[in-house]
Amino acid sequence: MPELPEVETVRRGLEPVMTGQRIIEADIRRPDLRWPLPANMQTRLEGKRILRLARRSKYILAELDSGETLIIHLGMSGRILIHGGQAPGAFHHALPSLEKHDHVVLDFDTGARVVFNDARRFGAMDLCETTEIDQHPMLATLGPEPLGNAFHEAYLTTRLKGRMTPIKSALLDQKVVAGLGNIYVCEALFQAGISPLRKAGRVSETRIASLVPIIRTVLGDAIEAGGSSLRDYRQTDGDLGYFQHRFRVYDRENAPCVTAGCPDVVRRVVQSGRSSFYCPSCQR
């Protein structure tokens, strides 16, 4: 599933194409994704201008001049691709034919086309009054953004205090911190030297103090690399992300630990149905 860096990469790719532009046609090619699409979605989108493109956790939020916001979640296999919209004087390329899993297609007044493709249909879209966006069921219970000012040592120390769930599970709890996923929690815990098996409430304040900036750095590096492409994820121009080439533990089971002088190999354990990758020697 695309995590925060992948969704932020997509948002940044869409921003210059969508922000300030008007949707002249919305082609809704099926009535549902993971859940039914919003009623009258076509008429609620057509003719509307996108004022702002934001991200909350793993959701893209397109604020419309109608007073509504389009909420987009990529799910497991969703991708958003941009076609057309060449600069003035550039050679014109015909828009490619739509594919089987192109479920929502937005054409803009610039000639650009934005296509939501989702083979497994675990993605989601909804429309919500912008003034009520924070109360939307998909967003209402989310914790602070890990790259925002509300996520800091004191906050995380308080949220982890007394918790007997593993630190890995605590960081994946979207009520604790929004947008973190399996890949980047594994990578951050490795860099912080914290075992994913350690009880969250038994991580010292000193180690939490180092974990918070490490989480920020890992996410920032992943965004800079365009995210991680393991299966379906693509950037908006169709290119792969590149952060998977920089994994230190994730998806490296039985590979030598990258820490100089460490004789151990990366191990994999299953926690709450998800694979955790770590080095038993470097992470305690």
UniProtKB/Swiss-Prot annotation:
Gene3D superfamilies: 1.10.8.50, MutM-like, N-terminal
Cofactor list: Zn(2+)
GO biological process: base-excision repair
Keywords of this entry: DNA damage, DNA repair, DNA-binding, Glycosidase, Hydrolase, Lyase, Metal-binding, Multifunctional enzyme, Zinc, Zinc-finger
Name of the protein in its database record: Formamidopyrimidine-DNA glycosylase
Pfam families cross-referenced by the UniProt entry: Fapy_DNA_glyco, H2TH
Quaternary data: Monomer.
Catalysed reaction, written as an equation: Hydrolysis of DNA containing ring-opened 7-methylguanine residues, releasing 2,6-diamino-4-hydroxy-5-(N-methyl)formamidopyrimidine; 2'-deoxyribonucleotide-(2'-deoxyribose 5'-phosphate)-2'-deoxyribonucleotide-DNA = a 3'-end 2'-deoxyribonucleotide-(2,3-dehydro-2,3-deoxyribose 5'-phosphate)-DNA + a 5'-end 5'-phospho-2'-deoxyribonucleoside-DNA + H(+)
Residue positions binding DNA: 101, 120, 163
Organism: Dinoroseobacter shibae (strain DSM 16493 / NCIMB 14021 / DFL 12)
Active site positions, chain numbering: 2-3, 58, 274
Gene (UniProt): mutM
Co-factor binding details: Binds 1 zinc ion per subunit.
Zinc finger (FPG-type): 248-284
Similarity annotation: Belongs to the FPG family.
Enzyme Commission number(s) of this protein: 3.2.2.23, 4.2.99.18
